Protein backbone atom coordinates (compact mmCIF):
# COMPACT_ATOMS: atom_id res chain seq x y z
CA UNK A 1 0.00 0.00 0.00
CA UNK A 2 2.88 1.80 0.18
CA UNK A 3 1.76 5.01 0.91
CA UNK A 4 1.14 6.80 3.94
CA UNK A 5 -2.12 6.67 5.79
CA UNK A 6 -1.56 10.38 5.97
CA UNK A 7 -2.54 10.74 2.34
CA UNK A 8 -5.57 8.51 2.67
CA UNK A 9 -6.74 10.21 5.81
CA UNK A 10 -6.57 13.61 4.14
CA UNK A 11 -9.29 12.51 1.78
CA UNK A 12 -11.69 11.67 4.57
CA UNK A 13 -12.73 15.30 4.53
CA UNK A 14 -13.31 15.45 0.79
CA UNK A 15 -16.38 14.45 -1.14
CA UNK A 16 -15.08 11.14 -2.37
CA UNK A 17 -15.75 10.23 -5.96
CA UNK A 18 -15.13 6.59 -6.77
CA UNK A 19 -12.57 6.13 -9.58
CA UNK A 20 -12.90 3.21 -11.93
CA UNK A 21 -11.87 -0.13 -10.45
CA UNK A 22 -12.75 -2.12 -13.56
CA UNK A 23 -10.41 -0.69 -16.20
CA UNK A 24 -7.46 -2.82 -17.22
CA UNK A 25 -4.13 -1.40 -16.13
CA UNK A 26 -1.39 -0.83 -18.69
CA UNK A 27 2.20 0.19 -18.07
CA UNK A 28 4.01 2.51 -18.31
CA UNK A 29 0.79 4.52 -18.85
CA UNK A 30 -0.65 3.75 -15.42
CA UNK A 31 2.53 4.80 -13.64
CA UNK A 32 1.25 8.29 -14.48
CA UNK A 33 -1.40 10.35 -12.70
CA UNK A 34 -5.11 9.48 -12.55
CA UNK A 35 -7.00 12.79 -12.29
CA UNK A 36 -10.32 11.05 -11.60
CA UNK A 37 -8.92 9.81 -8.26
CA UNK A 38 -9.13 12.39 -5.44
CA UNK A 39 -6.07 10.89 -3.73
CA UNK A 40 -2.94 9.44 -5.30
CA UNK A 41 0.62 8.76 -4.25
CA UNK A 42 3.91 7.50 -5.64
CA UNK A 43 6.27 5.99 -3.11
CA UNK A 44 9.83 4.71 -3.16
CA UNK A 45 11.87 3.20 -0.34
CA UNK A 46 15.18 1.43 -0.47
CA UNK A 47 18.37 0.18 1.12
CA UNK A 48 21.67 1.56 -0.15
CA UNK A 49 25.36 1.19 0.63
CA UNK A 50 28.50 3.13 -0.26
CA UNK A 51 31.89 1.77 -1.29
CA UNK A 52 32.99 1.55 2.34
CA UNK A 53 30.03 -0.66 3.18
CA UNK A 54 28.08 1.95 5.15
CA UNK A 55 24.33 1.32 5.02
CA UNK A 56 21.56 3.83 4.34
CA UNK A 57 17.80 3.85 3.90
CA UNK A 58 15.59 6.29 2.03
CA UNK A 59 11.96 7.18 1.51
CA UNK A 60 10.65 9.53 -1.20
CA UNK A 61 6.89 9.96 -1.48
CA UNK A 62 4.82 12.27 -3.67
CA UNK A 63 1.17 12.81 -2.71
CA UNK A 64 -1.58 14.36 -4.79
CA UNK A 65 -4.81 15.31 -2.99
CA UNK A 66 -6.89 16.75 -5.82
CA UNK A 67 -4.81 19.81 -6.84
CA UNK A 68 -2.72 19.94 -3.68
CA UNK A 69 0.73 18.34 -3.93
CA UNK A 70 2.68 17.14 -0.90
CA UNK A 71 5.97 15.27 -0.60
CA UNK A 72 8.11 13.58 2.04
CA UNK A 73 11.81 12.70 1.91
CA UNK A 74 13.55 10.73 4.66
CA UNK A 75 17.17 9.60 4.95
CA UNK A 76 18.52 7.04 7.42
CA UNK A 77 22.27 6.82 8.06
CA UNK A 78 22.46 3.44 9.78
CA UNK A 79 26.05 3.59 11.04
CA UNK A 80 25.53 7.05 12.61
CA UNK A 81 22.02 6.20 13.86
CA UNK A 82 20.96 9.42 12.20
CA UNK A 83 17.50 10.00 10.70
CA UNK A 84 16.33 13.13 8.90
CA UNK A 85 13.11 14.00 7.13
CA UNK A 86 11.86 16.80 4.92
CA UNK A 87 8.45 17.80 3.57
CA UNK A 88 6.92 20.02 0.90
CA UNK A 89 3.44 21.28 0.09
CA UNK A 90 2.37 23.27 -2.97
CA UNK A 91 -0.69 23.90 -5.05
CA UNK A 92 -0.43 22.27 -8.45
CA UNK A 93 0.95 24.64 -11.08
CA UNK A 94 3.35 24.08 -13.99
CA UNK A 95 6.90 24.56 -12.83
CA UNK A 96 5.89 24.31 -9.17
CA UNK A 97 4.21 20.95 -8.58
CA UNK A 98 2.57 18.59 -11.06
CA UNK A 99 1.98 15.00 -12.13
CA UNK A 100 1.65 13.98 -15.77
CA UNK A 101 -0.90 11.50 -17.04
CA UNK A 102 0.15 8.66 -19.33
CA UNK A 103 3.68 8.44 -17.88
CA UNK A 104 5.66 8.73 -14.66
CA UNK A 105 6.58 12.40 -14.31
CA UNK A 106 5.93 13.83 -10.84
CA UNK A 107 7.50 16.90 -9.29
CA UNK A 108 7.28 19.13 -6.25
CA UNK A 109 9.71 22.00 -6.83
CA UNK A 110 13.12 20.36 -7.35
CA UNK A 111 12.06 16.94 -6.04
CA UNK A 112 11.29 14.83 -9.09
CA UNK A 113 10.45 11.31 -10.22
CA UNK A 114 10.52 10.51 -13.92
CA UNK A 115 10.74 7.43 -16.10
CA UNK A 116 13.57 7.15 -18.61
CA UNK A 117 13.01 5.83 -22.15
CA UNK A 118 14.61 2.57 -20.97
CA UNK A 119 12.05 2.24 -18.15
CA UNK A 120 14.22 3.25 -15.19
CA UNK A 121 12.82 5.53 -12.48
CA UNK A 122 14.95 8.66 -12.09
CA UNK A 123 14.56 10.02 -8.57
CA UNK A 124 15.85 13.28 -7.08
CA UNK A 125 15.26 14.78 -3.63
CA UNK A 126 17.25 16.92 -1.24
CA UNK A 127 17.27 18.46 2.19
CA UNK A 128 19.53 19.26 5.11
CA UNK A 129 20.83 15.69 5.13
CA UNK A 130 22.07 16.04 1.55
CA UNK A 131 21.00 15.51 -2.06
CA UNK A 132 19.90 12.10 -3.33
CA UNK A 133 19.86 11.15 -7.02
CA UNK A 134 19.02 7.61 -8.02
CA UNK A 135 18.44 5.52 -11.11
CA UNK A 136 16.09 2.66 -10.20
CA UNK A 137 15.88 -0.13 -12.78
CA UNK A 138 12.99 -2.61 -12.38
CA UNK A 139 14.16 -6.19 -11.79
CA UNK A 140 10.60 -7.56 -11.77
CA UNK A 141 7.39 -6.55 -13.55
CA UNK A 142 4.61 -4.62 -11.80
CA UNK A 143 2.57 -6.55 -9.22
CA UNK A 144 -1.19 -5.93 -8.99
CA UNK A 145 -2.37 -6.30 -5.41
CA UNK A 146 -5.81 -7.54 -4.46
CA UNK A 147 -8.21 -8.39 -7.28
CA UNK A 148 -6.52 -7.31 -10.54
CA UNK A 149 -5.05 -4.32 -8.76
CA UNK A 150 -8.13 -3.42 -6.70
CA UNK A 151 -7.20 -3.24 -3.02
CA UNK A 152 -10.26 -3.21 -0.78
CA UNK A 153 -10.02 -1.44 2.57
CA UNK A 154 -13.65 -2.02 3.56
CA UNK A 155 -17.01 -3.36 2.36
CA UNK A 156 -18.10 -0.23 0.48
CA UNK A 157 -17.26 0.55 -3.14
CA UNK A 158 -15.56 3.79 -2.10
CA UNK A 159 -13.38 1.95 0.42
CA UNK A 160 -10.99 0.68 -2.24
CA UNK A 161 -8.07 1.80 -4.37
CA UNK A 162 -5.93 0.68 -7.29
CA UNK A 163 -2.63 -0.56 -5.90
CA UNK A 164 0.47 -1.48 -7.91
CA UNK A 165 4.03 -2.25 -6.82
CA UNK A 166 7.38 -2.93 -8.38
CA UNK A 167 8.79 -5.00 -5.55
CA UNK A 168 12.43 -4.95 -6.59
CA UNK A 169 14.44 -2.31 -8.44
CA UNK A 170 18.22 -2.17 -8.76
CA UNK A 171 19.47 1.17 -7.44
CA UNK A 172 22.53 3.17 -8.46
CA UNK A 173 23.21 6.81 -7.80
CA UNK A 174 24.82 9.37 -5.55
CA UNK A 175 24.27 11.13 -2.25
CA UNK A 176 25.93 14.53 -1.94
CA UNK A 177 26.65 15.72 1.59
CA UNK A 178 28.82 18.70 2.56
CA UNK A 179 29.98 18.98 -1.03
CA UNK A 180 31.17 15.37 -1.19
CA UNK A 181 29.49 12.93 -3.59
CA UNK A 182 29.15 9.30 -2.49
CA UNK A 183 28.37 6.63 -5.11
CA UNK A 184 25.62 4.29 -3.91
CA UNK A 185 24.15 0.94 -4.92
CA UNK A 186 21.31 -1.12 -3.52
CA UNK A 187 17.70 -2.16 -3.97
CA UNK A 188 14.42 -0.26 -3.90
CA UNK A 189 10.66 -0.78 -3.76
CA UNK A 190 8.01 1.25 -5.63
CA UNK A 191 4.34 1.64 -4.71
CA UNK A 192 1.67 3.56 -6.61
CA UNK A 193 -1.85 3.82 -5.26
CA UNK A 194 -4.88 5.91 -6.19
CA UNK A 195 -8.53 6.03 -5.20
CA UNK A 196 -11.17 7.81 -3.18
CA UNK A 197 -9.11 7.62 0.00
CA UNK A 198 -12.05 6.58 2.17
CA UNK A 199 -11.26 4.25 5.08
CA UNK A 200 -13.71 2.26 7.20
CA UNK A 201 -14.94 4.11 10.26
CA UNK A 202 -13.36 1.56 12.59
CA UNK A 203 -9.83 1.93 11.14
CA UNK A 204 -7.53 3.66 13.64
CA UNK A 205 -4.35 3.24 11.60
CA UNK A 206 -2.26 0.65 9.88
CA UNK A 207 0.99 -1.29 9.87
CA UNK A 208 2.55 -1.86 6.43
CA UNK A 209 5.48 -4.13 5.63
CA UNK A 210 7.58 -4.44 2.46
CA UNK A 211 10.11 -7.28 2.72
CA UNK A 212 12.82 -8.03 0.17
CA UNK A 213 14.50 -11.36 0.90
CA UNK A 214 17.92 -12.47 -0.28
CA UNK A 215 16.41 -15.52 -2.01
CA UNK A 216 14.77 -13.11 -4.48
CA UNK A 217 11.25 -13.17 -3.03
CA UNK A 218 9.24 -10.26 -1.64
CA UNK A 219 6.34 -9.90 0.76
CA UNK A 220 3.89 -7.03 1.19
CA UNK A 221 1.58 -7.07 4.21
CA UNK A 222 -0.74 -4.48 5.67
CA UNK A 223 -2.71 -4.69 8.87
CA UNK A 224 -5.52 -2.20 9.19
CA UNK A 225 -5.96 -1.73 12.93
CA UNK A 226 -9.01 -1.04 14.99
CA UNK A 227 -8.67 1.07 18.14
CA UNK A 228 -8.30 -2.10 20.22
CA UNK A 229 -5.35 -3.22 18.09
CA UNK A 230 -7.15 -6.02 16.25
CA UNK A 231 -6.92 -6.34 12.47
CA UNK A 232 -9.91 -5.56 10.28
CA UNK A 233 -11.07 -8.29 7.86
CA UNK A 234 -9.66 -6.30 4.95
CA UNK A 235 -6.04 -6.57 6.08
CA UNK A 236 -4.13 -8.54 3.47
CA UNK A 237 -0.88 -9.02 1.58
CA UNK A 238 0.94 -10.39 -1.46
CA UNK A 239 3.85 -12.82 -1.78
CA UNK A 240 6.05 -12.45 -4.86
CA UNK A 241 8.14 -15.55 -5.73
CA UNK A 242 11.86 -15.30 -6.60
CA UNK A 243 11.33 -15.89 -10.30
CA UNK A 244 8.85 -13.74 -12.24
CA UNK A 245 5.51 -15.47 -12.10
CA UNK A 246 2.11 -15.26 -10.50
CA UNK A 247 2.07 -13.29 -7.24
CA UNK A 248 0.17 -15.00 -4.43
CA UNK A 249 -2.53 -12.91 -2.71
CA UNK A 250 -2.73 -13.43 1.05
CA UNK A 251 -5.54 -13.01 3.53
CA UNK A 252 -4.73 -11.86 7.04
CA UNK A 253 -5.83 -15.29 8.27
CA UNK A 254 -2.82 -16.69 6.37
CA UNK A 255 -0.48 -14.68 8.60
CA UNK A 256 0.72 -15.26 12.17
CA UNK A 257 1.77 -11.84 13.46
CA UNK A 258 3.41 -10.94 16.78
CA UNK A 259 4.88 -7.69 18.07
CA UNK A 260 8.08 -8.44 20.00
CA UNK A 261 9.12 -5.07 21.43
CA UNK A 262 8.19 -1.38 21.48
CA UNK A 263 9.76 2.08 21.30
CA UNK A 264 8.42 5.38 22.63
CA UNK A 265 9.09 8.61 20.76
CA UNK A 266 10.68 11.31 22.93
CA UNK A 267 8.85 13.97 20.87
CA UNK A 268 5.32 12.74 20.15
CA UNK A 269 5.29 10.30 23.12
CA UNK A 270 3.70 7.77 20.76
CA UNK A 271 4.47 4.13 21.55
CA UNK A 272 5.31 2.22 18.37
CA UNK A 273 5.95 -1.48 17.85
CA UNK A 274 9.69 -1.95 17.25
CA UNK A 275 10.04 -5.63 16.41
CA UNK A 276 7.87 -8.28 14.81
CA UNK A 277 7.69 -11.98 14.13
CA UNK A 278 5.80 -12.90 10.96
CA UNK A 279 4.93 -16.41 9.80
CA UNK A 280 3.20 -17.24 6.52
CA UNK A 281 2.94 -21.02 6.53
CA UNK A 282 1.58 -21.25 2.98
CA UNK A 283 4.87 -19.96 1.56
CA UNK A 284 7.12 -21.46 4.24
CA UNK A 285 8.12 -18.09 5.67
CA UNK A 286 9.07 -17.50 9.32
CA UNK A 287 11.03 -14.30 9.98
CA UNK A 288 11.80 -11.65 12.55
CA UNK A 289 11.96 -7.94 11.68
CA UNK A 290 13.86 -5.28 13.62
CA UNK A 291 14.45 -1.57 12.90
CA UNK A 292 17.99 -0.62 11.90
CA UNK A 293 17.52 2.68 13.76
CA UNK A 294 14.95 3.07 16.53
CA UNK A 295 13.99 6.68 15.82
CA UNK A 296 12.64 6.91 12.27
CA UNK A 297 9.55 8.95 13.14
CA UNK A 298 8.34 11.63 10.72
CA UNK A 299 6.50 14.73 11.90
CA UNK A 300 4.83 16.58 9.04
CA UNK A 301 3.22 19.80 10.32
CA UNK A 302 4.03 21.58 7.05
CA UNK A 303 2.28 19.09 4.78
CA UNK A 304 0.04 16.16 5.75
CA UNK A 305 -0.02 17.10 9.43
CA UNK A 306 0.38 13.47 10.50
CA UNK A 307 3.09 11.96 12.69
CA UNK A 308 4.09 8.43 11.68
CA UNK A 309 7.00 5.98 11.83
CA UNK A 310 8.54 4.79 8.58
CA UNK A 311 11.89 3.13 8.56
CA UNK A 312 14.54 0.74 7.35
CA UNK A 313 14.57 -2.68 9.01
CA UNK A 314 16.53 -5.94 8.93
CA UNK A 315 14.92 -9.34 8.29
CA UNK A 316 16.21 -12.73 9.45
CA UNK A 317 14.62 -16.16 9.64
CA UNK A 318 13.78 -19.08 7.37
CA UNK A 319 11.91 -19.78 4.16
CA UNK A 320 11.20 -23.34 3.08
CA UNK A 321 13.21 -24.36 6.19
CA UNK A 322 16.34 -22.71 4.86
CA UNK A 323 18.00 -19.68 6.45
CA UNK A 324 17.06 -16.40 4.82
CA UNK A 325 17.89 -12.77 5.47
CA UNK A 326 16.80 -9.55 3.89
CA UNK A 327 15.67 -5.98 4.25
CA UNK A 328 12.35 -4.29 4.87
CA UNK A 329 10.60 -0.97 5.12
CA UNK A 330 7.84 -0.67 7.70
CA UNK A 331 5.22 2.06 8.04
CA UNK A 332 3.26 2.58 11.27
CA UNK A 333 0.41 5.09 11.36
CA UNK A 334 -2.22 6.02 13.91
CA UNK A 335 -0.02 5.53 16.98
CA UNK A 336 0.41 9.27 17.46
CA UNK A 337 -3.30 9.96 16.95
CA UNK A 338 -5.44 10.64 13.93
CA UNK A 339 -5.10 14.40 13.94
CA UNK A 340 -5.65 15.03 10.25
CA UNK A 341 -6.15 18.59 8.96
CA UNK A 342 -9.07 19.37 6.69
CA UNK A 343 -8.62 20.25 3.04
CA UNK A 344 -9.63 23.86 3.68
CA UNK A 345 -6.90 24.13 6.30
CA UNK A 346 -4.32 22.57 3.99
CA UNK A 347 -5.23 24.85 1.10
CA UNK A 348 -5.15 27.93 3.33
CA UNK A 349 -1.77 26.84 4.67
CA UNK A 350 -0.43 26.51 1.13
CA UNK A 351 -1.81 29.86 -0.03
CA UNK A 352 -0.47 31.64 3.05
CA UNK A 353 3.09 31.23 1.81
CA UNK A 354 2.49 32.73 -1.67
CA UNK A 355 -0.27 32.80 -4.26
CA UNK A 356 0.99 29.53 -5.74
CA UNK A 357 3.43 27.83 -3.39
CA UNK A 358 3.13 26.01 -0.11
CA UNK A 359 5.71 25.27 2.53
CA UNK A 360 8.87 23.24 2.82
CA UNK A 361 10.17 22.31 6.25
CA UNK A 362 12.59 19.81 7.74
CA UNK A 363 13.53 18.03 10.94
CA UNK A 364 16.24 15.68 12.03
CA UNK A 365 16.31 12.98 14.67
CA UNK A 366 18.92 10.74 16.16
CA UNK A 367 22.53 11.95 16.21
CA UNK A 368 22.88 15.54 15.10
CA UNK A 369 26.13 16.90 13.66
Q: Residue spans of the language-model regions?
A:
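Bacterial Sec-dependent signal peptides at the C-terminal "C-region" and cleavage site
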Residues: 3, 7-22
Amino acid sequence: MGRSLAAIALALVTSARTPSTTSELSFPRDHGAHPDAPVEWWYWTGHLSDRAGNAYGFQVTFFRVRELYLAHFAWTDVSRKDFRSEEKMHLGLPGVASAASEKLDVSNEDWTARQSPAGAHLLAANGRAGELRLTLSPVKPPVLHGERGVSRKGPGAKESSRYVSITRLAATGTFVRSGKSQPLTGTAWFDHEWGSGVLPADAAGWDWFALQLDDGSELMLYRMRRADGSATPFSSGTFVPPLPGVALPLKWSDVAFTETRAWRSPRSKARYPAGWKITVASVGLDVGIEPLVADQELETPGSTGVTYWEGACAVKGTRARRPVAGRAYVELTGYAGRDVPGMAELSARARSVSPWAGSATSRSAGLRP
